[in-house]
Amino acid sequence: DSWNHFFNNYGMNQIDLDVFSFLLNKGINNKQNLDTETNKLRVNVHQKVLQRNHEVRNSEATVKTRGKYQRIFREDIVLPNYDYQCAVTGIKTLSLLRAAHIVRWADNEKERLNPQNGICLSVLADACFEKGFITIDSDYKVRVSDQAEKDPALYDEISKYDGVKINLPKIKENRPAKRFLLE
């Protein structure tokens, strides 16, 4: 609210990236020094998402930037969409949450930043999803694979979610695309 008042009061509708970075770093008390390169990438990602251009070409996703793209996808897109909780388990401990790609990063350049290709999962749910022990059907219900029964402890942990509808983002446009879930 104070930022809104500041910008409206002084008629500002644009801000230089360096000034934005300075203010952002001041606002977070320099707990995390955000470099200009990361901020430029963050702005670029948000512009791409708004334009529905979710592509990150392999030539863009160098070893140096891939992690930054994925961090922005996690912190700015997926976790906020799911109110910072696992869509399957409801776990809210931030350090245990992952931004899972439904269609893997390596498999589709065009959908890497697509909010509909991301789902917030806990560490265990993410590993189970990645290995196929759990899937999410087109009705957004968790399905536990028969393979999970081979490990009674694992099956005991995840079977309680079988048939349960996942927690979905409030904004319908950010919910998992059924076409991705069916791949």
Language-model features: locations:
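A detector for short metal-coordination/catalytic motifs
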Residues: N58, T62-V63, K68-F73, N81, ...
